[in-house]
Amino acid sequence: MMTIYGVVGYPVEHSLSPVMHNAAFKALDMDCAYHKFEVKGEHLKDAILGARYLGFGGLNVTIPHKEAALRIMEPDRTALEIGAANTLDFKQMRAFNTDAAGAIDALRDGGVELENKGVLVLGAGGAARAVVYGLVKEGATVTIANRTTAKAADLAAYMRSFGSVFGTSLDSLGEKVRAVDIVINTTPIGMGWEDKPLVTRDMLDRSQAVFDLVYRPVETPLLREARAAGAKTIDGISMLARQGAKSFEIWTGVKPPVDVMERSARDAL
């Protein structure tokens, strides 16, 4: 009997998760399918419980439901400490967060070392929470820069219980960029074709790495600037595929072909 998985969010029409997971199921000849479901916040609990009672294997949870998912199913330690869940497993009846691990795996697979490295994270929203958590757990020193300095300071204060984290403004950004080994963009800047990147080539050099979580477009203005400076670059599809692979493994106990998932996502864009 086929096992169904899916992603719930609002909106969810542009999700690449079905393409990635179905490609992995096909490659492994597994009798499973993955679909997307648009669910508003007021219906989230009913949708999750309904999927469970219908025999689904599990769900991914995306914007804007990641925090609410913690209140519906018992979170594991990582999801609890991050304050958000993106993966629900109905066999274990647990909520997990694979975003942090996906970001770290993307950096590692891109040849970037993290222990004792300085990292500048742009943005202090939900995506930043998972990324900063993953970084400090790997022994990096993290500076969070945000337009609203108080928000960066608040996130840094919370994450400081897990490692070395500081909050700052976007003022004098060039100096802050030059002081670190890695720059990570967790903001939506770059989704618009005319968006101007916060970090430009004159702030960077070839010893640094730049990671942009934005994946529409894959080649963001920030990554173009980084390449022009000779810096190492990692794009958002790399993280998307790896967080998806972690969810797949939680549900099935099988390590999926990450290369197949990543290629299918790139081909779908």
Swiss-Prot record:
UniProt keyword list: Amino-acid biosynthesis, Aromatic amino acid biosynthesis, NADP, Oxidoreductase
Residues where shikimate binds: S15, L16, S17, T62, N86, D99, Y215
Chain segments annotated as coiled-coil in the UniProt record: none
Biological processes annotated in GO: amino acid biosynthetic process; aromatic amino acid family biosynthetic process; chorismate biosynthetic process; shikimate metabolic process
Catalyzed reaction equations: shikimate + NADP(+) = 3-dehydroshikimate + NADPH + H(+)
Metabolic or biological pathway, per its Swiss-Prot or TrEMBL entry: Metabolic intermediate biosynthesis; chorismate biosynthesis; chorismate from D-erythrose 4-phosphate and phosphoenolpyruvate: step 4/7
Active-site residues, record numbering mapped to chain: K66 (proton acceptor)
UniProt function note: Involved in the biosynthesis of the chorismate, which leads to the biosynthesis of aromatic amino acids. Catalyzes the reversible NADPH linked reduction of 3-dehydroshikimate (DHSA) to yield shikimate (SA).
Known partners and oligomeric status: Homodimer.
Protein family per UniProt: Belongs to the shikimate dehydrogenase family.
Protein's name in the database: Shikimate dehydrogenase (NADP(+))
